[in-house]
Design a protein with these regions (language model features):
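Glycine-rich phosphate-binding loop signature in dinucleotide/nucleotide-binding domains
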Residues: 84-90
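A short, flexible beta-alpha/helix-coil linker loop
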Residues: 9-13, 63-66, 122-124
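N-terminal subdomain of nucleotide-sugar transferases
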Residues: 1-48, 52-54
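Active-site proximal beta-strand in glycosyltransferases
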Residues: 3, 108-124
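Short, Asp-centered acidic motifs that coordinate Mg2+ and/or phosphate
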Residues: 91-92, 114
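Short His-centered aromatic/hydrophobic patch
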Residues: 95-100, 119
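Generic beta-sheet signal
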Residues: 6, 41, 61, 118-119
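A short, charged, and often flexible helix/loop element on the N-terminal side
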Residues: 54-83
Length: 124
């Protein structure tokens, strides 16, 4: 299955070392292990992908470093990701929930794409 993993959260570098980054890497790693064709679409990559994920196709839609209207920039990046995926036509979109991103909702509505909205938050 062709799966697009989307992370439009600028606070999470998908190739980083923070907990959310490691979680994304583990999900992608498991999907690949199960034989799926996975591509990562993110606004922030981090510096170096883990060696075992270096072959996973990755597209970045970076946000400006200093932006007066960061929320608008995030929404525009999400639109750019959605536009790319509308032409790529994955079988499934797996989106890590982030504010101002409507990638999965848009593709489900316009293309009928199946999806997973991953909501992952610490319990306090």
């Amino acid at each position: 299955m062709r799966i697009a993993y989307v992370c439009a959260d600028p606070g999470i570098p998908v190739h980083g070392t923070k907990g959310a980054s490691v979680h994304i890497q583990d999900v992608v790693r498991e999907l690949v292990r199960r034989g799926h064709d996975v591509g990562i679409h993110a606004v922030r990559l981090g510096e170096h992908p883990p060696a075992d994920l270096a072959g996973v196709p990755t597209w970045t839609h970076p946000l400006p470093a200093h932006c007066a209207d960061r929320e608008k920039a995030q929404a525009q990046a999400a639109d750019a990701i959605a536009e790319r995926l509308e032409s790529d036509a994955p079988d499934l979109v797996w989106e890590r929930y982030s504010l101002f991103s409507t990638v999965l909702a848009r593709l489900a509505r316009t293309r009928g794409v199946r999806g997973v909205l991953e909501v992952n938050a610490p319990l306090i």
